[in-house]
């Protein structure tokens, strides 16, 4: 139980790094504290909903796919980690949506899509659902708030490195799923 909790907290931190790195940029926009609160909370809610949907789908798939489900889950985590590792080095201009109304909804959805894949992986390997989604929701909320606050002051120094770290952590979990086999 403790080992699973630690693993889920590390994975939740890795997934929250994407939200953290994007929140760093959004933190430079001069948002009010009430806006920052809403942004972090909305991202957290989406980081509960998306992995929950993924875990339900993963449990259904694992019942039919058996051992292959572990390999598929590991593959998804490795793919997601590699995308996060490569992403900071791609030349692209990040555009920020207005962090209110539908813009906030679209922003939170886009930041939490990786949690859907992670949830699918966790569902396939039989992780504890409530523990996983609460860990992901809380961690992404806290990391988003942290990113927004740090972004107000230090965005140019931290930038893409947090996403890079998150990618390496997810790849590590993907490899861990493959090791027993």
Curated annotation (Swiss-Prot):
GO terms for cellular component: plasma membrane. One of its GO terms (molecular function) is manganese ion transmembrane transporter activity. Pfam families: Mntp. It is a multi-pass membrane protein. Its main location: membrane. Keywords: Cell membrane, Ion transport, Manganese, Membrane, Transmembrane, Transmembrane helix, Transport. The keyword Transport applies. The chain crosses the membrane at residues 5-25, 36-56, 66-86, 102-122, 130-150, 158-178. It is found in: Cell membrane. InterPro entries: Mntp/YtaF, Put_MntP. Probably functions as a manganese efflux pump. Belongs to the MntP (TC 9.B.29) family. HAMAP family: MntP_pump (MF_01521). This is Putative manganese efflux pump MntP. The gene is mntP.
């Amino acid at each position: 139980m403790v080992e699973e909790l630690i693993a889920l907290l590390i994975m939740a931190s890795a997934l929250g790094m994407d939200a953290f790195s994007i929140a760093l940029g959004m933190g430079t926009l001069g948002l009010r504290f009430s806006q920052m609160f809403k942004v972090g909370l909305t991202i957290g809610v989406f980081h509960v909903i998306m992995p929950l949907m993924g875990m339900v789908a993963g449990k259904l798939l694992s019942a039919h796919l058996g051992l292959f489900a572990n390999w598929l889950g590991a593959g998804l985590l490795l793919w997601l980690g590699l995308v996060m590792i490569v992403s900071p080095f791609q030349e692209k201009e990040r555009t920020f949506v207005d962090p209110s109304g539908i813009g906030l909804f679209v922003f939170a959805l886009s930041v939490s899509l990786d949690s859907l894949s992670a949830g699918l992986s966790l569902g396939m390997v039989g992780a504890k659902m409530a523990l996983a989604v609460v860990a992901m929701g809380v961690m992404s909320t806290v990391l988003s708030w942290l990113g927004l606050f740090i972004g107000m002051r230090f965005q140019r120094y931290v930038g893409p490195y947090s996403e890079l770290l998150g990618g390496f952590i997810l790849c590590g979990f993907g490899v861990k799923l493959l090791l027993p086999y």
